[in-house]
């Protein structure tokens, strides 16, 4: 009888897929606690690098207070305009159609206050907020906040437990530190662009990434630093600390074997476009037919592309069977032979000729039947509409208090007990002045009104 009961219980156990779905369903996140609830973060940031760092902490439940310039807000609000100009009722800097979409990706879940860092009244506000905060995140030029009297050395005297994270392009010390930086500068000096794009003999040149990878990667690394510093404070030292993140340093950290290759052999890693210098076949080919020939979007009318990964000798043999070219399979049966530059040119040319009368979906179907790894190159529309990513919450519809219905990226990871979550996308400049400055800085309604009239907040 006991065996029958145990067997029935085992039979009712969910599959691993069912268990994961039940455990990580993003729609249930708001019924669970937050990992960083009670942690207060002061975000004195602009553009993407600093704001994304603070926002990653906000996804985990930290109370992130974003400080912007009065009236105008920070610069990213003025890129890629959207349609709510009412966010700028008192400013002559009103964007033509409102807040930029570029602002959304790096600032969800934050509280928004305005404060002029240059003025004594604004600096006094920062000090009051820092005294009651766990973390300050800042990405102005190195030493700027120190000159204003609100840098780490000044604020740590007010709050010895404060974790202060400075992020910037070239670091706070060294001969190149004084330059300003953006993502594109960081990737360029860090060596990333030098390895991206087609080589000259293919008609190519170094290529930049459309997505600001160095900024978002850097923001994540900054968040890791902060979490480590908080752990050290709470479990070991009892004191805060000062952390620095260099955008260029972070890019260099991602260069794989490029630096060891140069250091040991004096060889500069080359650009190799959509192919791979180490593996073949392991790259992107062009398919000759569009998947959406009737689309009104010009980019969708273009030919499609697909990634094919068949560098294993057995996989390559099957790929040649699909293509119908036994001679190439025999000639390049071993990986050492096909990974050579001239061999790759010949092989990829063969593949593109084979795909010239096919869409990327047709190519994928043929490769799937042969059990060959592949993935059509998707655009943002295809990602947004795919049921897998919708079900997992990678793409979410958000009923935002400012935008209304808004499609937005969800958090990139999942946690069973304390899941990250998306609460709101943004708010107007200074939307939380009364709540935050009244509660934490102790300012009365009369003081808030006076500071607003003086354009200090």
Predicted regions, residues:
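Nucleotide donor/acceptor-binding cores
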Residues: 39, 241, 304
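Glycine-rich beta-alpha junction loops
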Residues: 71, 170-171, 247-252, 289-291, ...
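Short, surface-exposed loop/helix-turn segments at secondary-structure junctions
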Residues: 77-85, 179, 261-270, 386-401
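Aromatic-enriched alpha-helical interface/lid elements that frame and gate functional surfaces
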Residues: 281-370, 374, 387
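Terminal low-complexity tails and localization/encapsulation signals of metabolic enzymes
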Residues: 1-40, 269, 275-280, 286-291, ...
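Conserved Rossmann-fold dehydrogenase catalytic segment
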Residues: 172, 202-212, 234-251, 271-275, ...
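Oxidoreductase and adenylate-handling cofactor-binding alpha/beta cores
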Residues: 200, 219-241, 254-264, 320-327
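N-terminal helix-loop segment corresponding to the beta1-alpha1 unit
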Residues: 2-236, 428, 434-457
